[in-house]
Amino acid sequence: MNLSNKELEGLDEIISDHREDFCPFLGRIEEEDKQFFLSSEMKEMYAGDTVPDFIASLQEAVKMPGQIYFATRASIGEWAFVTVFTDTLDYMEVSPTEYQEAKEKTVLGENAAWMPSVDLKPFNRDFPKPSSADFIGKGVEFLNRHQSSRIFMNPEKGLKQLLDFLRVHKYDGRQLMLNNRIDSVDKLKKALKKAQALLKNKSDETEWEEVESDMAHLGFEPGWGKKLGYVKEFLALLSDILAAPEPVVLEKFLDRIPMIFSLVVLSPHGFFGQAGVFGKPDTGGQVVYILDQVKALEHELKSRLDEKGLDITPKILVVTRLIPEAEGTNCDMEEELIRGTDNCHIVRVPFRDESGEVVRQWISRFRIWPYLERFSTEAQNIILSKLQGNPDLIIGNYSDGNLVASLIAQRLGVTQCTIAHALEKTKYLYSDLYWQDNNDKYHFACQYTADLISMNYSDFIITSTYQEIAGTNDSVGQYESYMNYTLPGLYRVVNGIDVFDPKFNVVSPGAAPDIFFSYKSKDRFPEHIEEIESILFEDNLEGSRGSLADPDKPLIFTMARLDKIKNLTGLVRWFGENEELRKTANLLVIGGFVDESLSSDDEEREQIRIMHSVIDELGLDGSVRWVGAHLGKRMTGEFYRYVADRKGVFVQPALFEAFGLTIIEAMSSGLPVFATVYGGPSEIIEDGKSGFTLDPNKGDECAEKLLEFIQKCQSDPGHWIKISDNALKRVEERYNWPLYAKRLMTFARVYGFWKFVTNLEREETVRYLEMLYGMVYRRLADPKEY
């Protein structure tokens, strides 16, 4: 039979040309005492000399009586589904709904009750999107091309929209771009010619005030620039758009419009603070990311406003949760100025229970869902009060922050940016399928529903890597995993998010350059050396286990939260089971608590027990040092450099890492890095050139890779220097905060324009998402479920 999807054409070939390999392959699946099979498992089960395209494309299989359902992914974002009848080798293509129904039957049985299907594809049918995977994560670039084409094809409509957009911008009641003298495209064209003639012979260094009256008479207000050289460039861009719009010109023009003066960053969960919070539950890289982010954004906003000559002080609020039982941190303070900024503040809003009483203690990020709706309302009122009006942009972080951002942005009509940091669905295998088994602990169904709502509400989504969106040829992206999935007994998703959607953009963060800089620098932080050496070598140090019997060995250093995904216990086992590596190097682990009784997090306590067990089992107390310290940023930067001085390495052994800020920090310090191949690190690191990637599922190979590098550096010290220099060069060119801030503000302006010209077209989507929120999310977030 012929299949309509080109992804499945290889099935004909495998049945006709490789039947002798395909039949045993199906037989092995049938013999297994389980119903679900992963891509890696199926590739190992196929015994042919060559791997046909169909086998290579397999992502998952579901075994049912007499037939096997396969999910195939021939290329990024391109999925198809087929069922093969094992007795006859007949097969047929099935829909995403039919495939999900097969999975549901394995959980709920043959007579499962009817379930609704969530399908957002019809709402996006008329929205432009690229067809090539090369454009995934380049949404702004694609939209500029599309919008330029729209203006060119229908200049009357397109230019009228641009005019209306220019007329809408004001601050504190004053127009910034155009006044009421220009109320048509024809008048704009005439006024523009007169303005360019007026400015033509004036010095570029002349300031706006000298021509303000004449320009206002023509219809132009002060937002065009401080100095006339800048104003001339701005007007020339407008002239080019009016004549023949080009994508690059349109982006440059929109990027100069003064439209962002205040923004709100939402990050409710964990202990969000500037000191004493790192190492506490649910508190890690996201806090560092946001604090560095807002510093860079404030600097960018101030620079842009200065170019415009506008005497406006930008304001940034980071809204998080107030925790009265703050455990020695400042998380019980309602407001706190962010150090290193002029007007960026942490604003803390409490969680309240059903009676309105403030919840005093920390709550796991997996259990905060009942509090978020009330939190969003209270936070919105505080935001409006402190900003004296609406923010110009709202940025959500992680699942909880993105949901709150969606609720506030929809109520206020503000542009929303989504940053996931990490989507839990790809971290926990089959966590959607077996959500009911883990509901008491993790509440995954509630979280995944919140994710689905917020990523579709959002005007634009930024990710640190391409893989976060769409994976690789061999692995599924985090967002891609939301294209179709099922929560048996609740609902199934047949079209949840489209990775080709132009709302996706990749922009990578950096590390604070005043903290994380090369070990070669003479301007170091010597005040921390004594404490660093205490952490490494002091006998009977409180909160530590193990000692380094031979302290002169090269040091393998790792530092992360002590949870299952970060896999610190896995690294200790790799190290301990490789005798040669133990003889050659020492291992320092900084993470969690050594004393289980000090932890309030269930998963962390489990990892503490495992860590002690591994050290005991392998007898590692003389070669592994485990410290439960929580380092400040300056201390962390100097720690990386101290390890680099001793020609050590940094290892990030996570089972999955969405980005890997510690990797950027270590590389910025000149420390060679070994990091997981799963997720963002494989984009950051050029394997073998600026660092090394590891497959955490193959611990013996990871240990050998570490050993090989350390031994090579001992025989050839220049090898360590080469990798170190390449790491420094890599982060300098690709991962820095000024570039991040510039791009994010460009995105905000372009998507602000896109929202303006298409807002009415999104109403149907909003109503659909409101229904999903009201009928599903609210029920899952009912306090009685917690």
Swiss-Prot record:
UniProt-listed Pfam families: Glycos_transf_1, GT-B_Sucrose_synth, SUS_EPBD, SUS_N
GO molecular function: sucrose synthase activity
Catalyzed reactions per annotation: an NDP-alpha-D-glucose + D-fructose = a ribonucleoside 5'-diphosphate + sucrose + H(+)
EC number from the UniProt entry: 2.4.1.13
Single Gene Ontology BP annotation: sucrose metabolic process
InterPro entries, alphabetized: Glyco_trans_1, Sucrose_synth_GT-B1, Sucrose_synthase_pln/cyn, SUS_EPBD, SUS_N
UniProt keyword Plastid present: no
Thermal properties: Optimum temperature is 65 degrees Celsius. Very thermounstable, complete loss of activity after 15 minutes at 60 degrees Celsius.
Noted pH dependence of activity: Optimum pH is 6.0.
Enzyme category, top tier: transferase
The organism's place on the tree of life at top rank: Bacteria
Region (GT-B glycosyltransferase): 259-736
Keywords: Glycosyltransferase, Transferase
Stated role: Catalyzes the reversible conversion of sucrose and a nucleotide disphosphate (NDP) into fructose and NDP-glucose; although the reaction is freely reversible in vitro, the physiological reaction seems to be sucrose cleavage. Unlike characterized plant enzymes prefers ADP as a cosubstrate, whereas plants prefer UDP. Its preference for ADP over UDP suggests it may directly link sucrose and glycogen metabolism.
Family per record: Belongs to the glycosyltransferase 1 family.
Subunit structure and binding partners: Homotetramer.
Protein name: Sucrose synthase
Organism expressing this protein natively: Denitrovibrio acetiphilus (strain DSM 12809 / NBRC 114555 / N2460)
Source taxonomy: Bacteria, Pseudomonadati, Deferribacterota, Deferribacteres, Deferribacterales
